[in-house]
Amino acid sequence: MAFSLEEESGRIKDCWDNQEVPALSTCSNANIFRRINAILDDSLDFSKVCTTPINRGIHDQLPDFQDSEEAITSRMLFPTSAQESPRGLPDANGLCLGLQSLSLTGWDRPWSTQDSDSSAQSNTQSVLSMLQNPLGNVLGKTPLSFLSLDPLGSDLDKFPAPSVRGSRLDTRPILDSRSSSPSDSDTSGFSSGSDHLSDLISSLRISPPLPFLSMTGNGPRDPLKMGVGSRMDQEQAALAAVAPSPTSAPKRWPGTSVWPSWDLLGAPKDPFSIEREARLHRQAAAVNEATCTWSGQLPPRNYKNPIYSCKVFLGGVPWDITEAGLVNTFRVFGSLSVEWPGKDGKHPRCPPKGNMPKGYVYLVFELEKSVRALLQACSHDPLSPDGLSEYYFKMSSRRMRCKEVQVIPWVLADSNFVWSPSQRLDPSRTVFVGALHGMLNAEALAAILNDLFGGVVYAGIDTDKHKYPIGSGRVTFNNQRSYLKAVTAAFVEIKTTKFTKKVQIDPYLEDSLCLICSSQPGPFFCRDQVCFKYFCRSCWHWRHSMEGLRHHSPLMRNQKN
């Protein structure tokens, strides 16, 4: 029901102060009161009802009000506290609605909380004064409140007014219930007695639905942003000003939201969760079963004047060995340094304090000829079945005498193997192979994956700054089918006469833009066939917040290498 605007203060004052005018004959809401009285068996007293008819003449004399800038701000459903129009949003005392002493609690400050504004409750009365209005005789002494006008145009009017308990009008009854449990939010009051009576009470609106008008812009704004955004901003400002004590803090339902998609699009609780999952995936071979197995003999190695890396591996060193003991033992071959194996694949210059040595260590010589001299001093068996010579060197520590340790060098030629030199290498058909055994060179890796999937044209072993293997490699195929078969296999177990090792196969990653937004770098790759593309952080969370995609594991390039 729409009501006209009144300009003359005397007219408004007469509306409320004149107690001698006829009661119901000229009331603008007379028809509704009569229907309510009929439902209540004619038990209402209309002697105190305001006698203001609808004056359409005055309304017609205000054609320019809606077009003025002042009107725009005054008709905003949720005006800011800093900018209050001279006309403002019509309050209960400025409208002749046919109800004497009408006042909506919380209307003038819709974002006040229950606990932060106890003084306002004493100043603002309920819609129907229990001492002066006809409904008070029947409905008891509990003040009533009407539902607020929802900016989204929802169906809140279908719900009954939850005010029989005397609570303030909560303008966010669904977004932020202050009940301690869902059971406390059951509707009561009119709806429990008569739905028809509730509909009549709800029809007593104090103003027509107000359109969403821009306060400063030229064009219309999005209703969803206007309604929800302004609510959130004003609510936060009101709560910050009130700052209730912890003892008076209201109870809330835990973690509920009407728009769960907003939570999914927001920032994750752990901003580094993707990086952590990517690091965990690099060790996935240790906890996953192999999907296929290769067993056989590695191809023989025939070297002519090999060139070695200056770095060698020592396995089976005495547990009480020290860096000084290692340097004193091997400095006869040349100047060297010691790298102790550390956590996360790092090699610190000395063993961690309080930790026992891992049983192996790396020696880094300054010159390649020092490695040659070391190998000549080792005992080895050149007639091994796979053609791989095993070198052993005898050393001693304070508590162990003549301990034989294994020396594993690396020939630089073993780092790369090209099966077809004329074949162009396509990075999009290249896989990354992790968790490689130290005895596996590029030629052997190419032979194994070619036996399993076919189409191998190149294999390479990743090395560090000393050109020593770091336990991973790359294999390129000449067709998409072989490439996808290798990626799908994911985990392959390799069995030889010398070792058994499970390796991990993933797509080879390059620097790429996000293939969703095409505006941000895409450091995260999803290897699942449903996605199989690069993502930025925001697009990853957006895509993988969907049901059925949350189990996908991200891949990242190892920036250290």
Swiss-Prot record:
Every RRM domain range: 310-407, 429-510
Chain positions covered by the region annotation Disordered: 158-194
Residue numbers marked as site, Important for the positionning of RRM1 relative to RRM2: 410
Keyword Repressor set for record: yes
Domain of life: Eukaryota
Positions of region (Necessary for stress granule assembly and correct localization in dcp1 bodies): 329-561
Binding site for Zn(2+) 2: 526, 531, 544, 552
Compositionally biased intervals (Low complexity): 176-194
UniProt modified residues of type Phosphoserine: 43
GO cellular component, one term: P-body
Location(s) in or outside the cell: Cytoplasm; Synapse; Cytoplasm, P-body; Cytoplasmic granule
Predominant subcellular localization, coarse grouping: cytoplasm
PROSITE patterns in the record: RRM
Positions annotated to bind Zn(2+) 1: 514, 517, 536, 539
Keyword Secreted attached: no
A GO biological process held by the record: positive regulation of neuron projection development
Sorted UniProt keywords: Activator, Cytoplasm, Membrane, Metal-binding, mRNA processing, Phosphoprotein, Repeat, Repressor, Ribonucleoprotein, RNA-binding, Synapse, Translation regulation, Zinc
Modified residues (Phosphothreonine): 171
Swiss-Prot/TrEMBL domain comment: The 2 RRM domains and the C-terminal region mediate interaction with CPE-containing RNA. The interdomain linker (411-429) acts as a hinge to fix the relative orientation of the 2 RRMs. The ZZ domain (509-566) coordinates 2 Zn ions and is probably implicated in mediating interactions with other proteins in addition to increasing the affinity of the RRMs for the CPEs. A continuous hydrophobic interface is formed between the 2 RRM.
Function statement: Sequence-specific RNA-binding protein that regulates mRNA cytoplasmic polyadenylation and translation initiation during oocyte maturation, early development and at postsynapse sites of neurons. Binds to the cytoplasmic polyadenylation element (CPE), an uridine-rich sequence element (consensus sequence 5'-UUUUUAU-3') within the 3'-UTR of mRNAs. In absence of phosphorylation and in association with TACC3 is also involved as a repressor of translation of CPE-containing mRNA; a repression that is relieved by phosphorylation or degradation.
Family of this protein: Belongs to the RRM CPEB family.
Assembly, per entry: Interacts with kinesin, dynein, APLP1, APLP2, TENT2/GLD2 and APP. Both phosphorylated and non phosphorylated forms interact with APLP1. Interacts with TENT4B; the interaction is required for TENT4B-mediated translational control.
Protein name (database record): Cytoplasmic polyadenylation element-binding protein 1
Organism of origin: Rattus norvegicus
